[in-house]
């Protein structure tokens, strides 16, 4: 649909920590500040999918899964809802 966005993919197998490196945090925040649509998509230990805004990368790195996601979906996954979340502003 002509909308560019970037997604950092992560998997958490146990615990609450989302393994974002400092370079990834910096890139996501900087890109977001310059108008880029950036997201962090995480599969949780219980197979849910959490979506965070890239601008929140520092909080995601610090708080991990304790931070409330902008979107949480369970199986069976609603892929259309996820797609819409990438192309619209998620607050």
Label each region the model flagged.
Residues 12-31:
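Mg2+/Mn2+-dependent nuclease catalytic core
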Residues 55-91:
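Helix-rich interaction surfaces within compact, conserved domain-sized segments
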Residues 22, 47, 72-74:
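Alpha-helical structural elements
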Residues 5, 50-52, 77:
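Sequence-level detector for tyrosine residue identity
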Residues 1-14:
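Conserved catalytic cores of phosphodiester-cleaving nucleases, focusing on short active-site segments
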Residues 29-58:
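Nucleic-acid nuclease catalytic cores
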């Amino acid at each position: 649909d002509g909308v560019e966005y970037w997604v950092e993919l992560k998997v958490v197998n146990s615990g609450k920590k989302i393994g974002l490196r400092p370079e990834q945090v910096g890139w996501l925040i900087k890109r977001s500040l310059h108008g880029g649509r950036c997201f962090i998509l995480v599969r949780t230990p219980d197979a849910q999918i959490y979506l965070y805004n890239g601008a929140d990368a520092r909080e995601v790195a610090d708080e991990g899964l304790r931070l409330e996601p902008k979107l949480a979906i369970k199986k069976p996954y609603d892929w259309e809802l996820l797609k819409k979340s990438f192309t619209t502003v998620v607050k």
